[in-house]
Amino acid sequence: MNFLHFLTTSLLLLGGSRLALADSASSAIKIKGNAFFNSDTNERFYVRGVDYQPGGSSTLVDPLADTSICKRDLPYLQGLNINTIRVYQVDNSANHDECMSALQDAGIYVILDLATSSNSISRLDAASSYNAVFLQGIFATIDAFKNYTNVLGFFAGNEVANTAENSATTTWVKAALRDAKEYISKNSDRDIPVGYSAADVAEIRVQCADFFACGNSSVRADFYGMNMYEWCGADSSFTISGYDQRMEEFANYSIPLFLSEYGCNDVTKESDGTPDRPFDEVDAIFSSEMSSVFSGGLVYQYSEEGNNYGLVVIDGDNVTISKNYETLKEKYASAANYTGDGDYSSSPATLTCPADDSYFTSFPLPTMPSEAKGFIESGAGQPLGFNAPSNQEFSANATALVSPGPHSVSTTINTNIVQATISQSSTSGSSSGSSSASTTASSSSVSSGSSISSGSSSMSTSYTSASGSSAHSSGSSSGSSSATSSASTFNLSRFYVFAGILAISGLVFA
């Protein structure tokens, strides 16, 4: 797409929109009390956006690294009158300057998931998936995006706990969130918020939210997202949907709360079978009816991925907008007029951590794996991107031997334990000789036990919302059984690269 075509498309889409001359997203977003604010103007910031992952969240595609994707989609994103997108996974080894700069100029902020479909906390075995490989990956992603002012924040996990039975998995997600916050405090020039995006599970809805918001500032989430699809169709309302009950449940919530996914598609269908989504909930979300508790939301989702949630249909370089796109465009144009502090709470009391009950279980947060502690002080090292070894491979019992040239790495991977022996021989200057170093590392055992199996093989990455509509299946939400590799499929070359980072950086401790 050449620049003239890009500009023409932008003007056609924007038409008479009040955002034709969008404000730049050059001011960082900060948190005060239970709300977001523009750090320069001190005006309250309401998240008004869409979830954006062309190709689907289970496919390893980085839409912020491919400039052709950015140039294709940006006019349509602007046309929706949005100020925020959520991106579910990125390649931390790629360059994102052009896309992030274009989004900033268009007045669009980014909320980014740190996990990927191959590097995430597994709901099937959360304890062992919380390891050095996982942390190196999310730290490297922080490094890749920390200098972009229009990064609003990071999600440490997405829908990892999707039933009451696997609620204990939140323990390891919160540990990862804590570690990400510490990494940012030591390795970033600005304090970028870190939060969690939760499935809307009625039995644990409040307990899960309170769990992430409780504790001191070093461990609690900075914000909280809910994936909520309860408002369904033109016959729904503030009370029928249960939104009034959500307002009561979270009236005293202490951190910014927003809908990280919303937009039910269990509605009246068009003649071609596509849903006619009225998006009437937008009128409530961006009003005094909800602004004291909620700070906006993100409609799921921008592109059609075979699940009837898409606002546009993408075919190569061609984008076709739907009736749903036009509906949301008008709703968001009206929502953009809602300003003011929204009766937010400037100094809410810190929440008490929920007690375990028949629905919700938590454990003391595990200590950071010893192999990963050096990343905090020395940095994550080389970003490995989508070629990184999966942390799920470290979750299975496996043994690998890698011998590329003069280096050899013998690694035994057990549940919750990584043992590595690294030997190296070298020749230097006019004299020859060899030196060897042997180091063994064992990750810290979790105080609550060596392992917790938080689900059964019947658990999947999809869930059903309270309204009964089946929501999407997100590859970055957790490691499913298909993401866990056996020893026979363990990728040795990728593991060697990672082991080399540990060895060279001196991060494998005796």
Curated annotation (Swiss-Prot):
Propeptide: 486-510
Protein name: 1,3-beta-glucanosyltransferase gas5
Post-translational modification: The GPI-anchor is attached to the protein in the endoplasmic reticulum and serves to target the protein to the cell surface. There, the glucosamine-inositol phospholipid moiety is cleaved off and the GPI-modified mannoprotein is covalently attached via its lipidless GPI glycan remnant to the 1,6-beta-glucan of the outer cell wall layer.
GO molecular function, one term: 1,3-beta-glucanosyltransferase activity
Function per UniProt: Splits internally a 1,3-beta-glucan molecule and transfers the newly generated reducing end (the donor) to the non-reducing end of another 1,3-beta-glucan molecule (the acceptor) forming a 1,3-beta linkage, resulting in the elongation of 1,3-beta-glucan chains in the cell wall.
GO biological process: cell wall (1->3)-beta-D-glucan metabolic process; fungal-type cell wall (1->3)-beta-D-glucan biosynthetic process; fungal-type cell wall organization
InterPro entries in alphabetical order: Glucanosyltransferase (IPR004886), Glycoside_hydrolase_SF (IPR017853)
Bridged cysteine pairs (disulfide): C70-C99, C214-C353, C232-C264
A Pfam family assignment: Glyco_hydro_72
